[in-house]
Amino acid sequence: GKNRYGDLNKVASFGDAPYACLVTRNVVMQRITRDQARKFAFDWRDKPLLHVQPGESFEIETWDAASGFFKSPDDKAIPANRPGFDRHPPLANPIGGPVYIEGAERGDVLLIDIEDIEVGDYSWVAIGPKRGPLGESTRWPELSGEHTTKIIKHTPGPSGTMRDGTMQFNDKISWPITPFIGTIGVAPDREVATSIDGQGMWGGNLDIRDVAVGNRIHLPVFHEGALFYLGDVHASQGDTEYTGTAAE
């Protein structure tokens, strides 16, 4: 469907050191669907959903960080009302994977070239008490008030797609859609890391806006096949999630 928060075509290559790769495309691109992208951990025990060759592009359709919970301003980020928040850590921030890259071995370096990201027709921002770096700010105490959800509509650009589209905050404020991948990585060596809190040299929930189209990500390989995951695609973000979320 068109209501997608993040479809990614990715090129990967690997070796004892990073090297450039020749992009090749299959007649039918392999794909992980949104319904399959419901993992909540980077787990080396997961069965791969795709097997790809080095240099092969593939696509992952993702859920937003709340698995579609936020659809209107009436949907608040109150933990007691959110599915999966009765677990510790919460079952939030779903990712798609793992993807098995043929020939990848422990000690290799996996290169991920982000070719394309397509977002859906809206995103959301949810703020509430003590959420994010500004959650206890004395300068902006309103950011730690009641739970508030903002739905941001997306409009297509001249291309007819969201690739050059606009985010409409209100009648007076808008800005370009600038999507990136919030959570990306491979299965860690020994531990199992959650997709909501886990971070390390293997990747994780990084929320860095530079993980975007045209950029290359380098990740160490700890397991045969690399076991690559991604999710938590954002339509826009500043330098961090100051109130606990970006435009999800």
What is the predicted function of each stretch?
Residues A65-K76, I117-I127, G225-A235:
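Short, Lys/Arg- and Gly-enriched loop/turn segments at beta-strand edges
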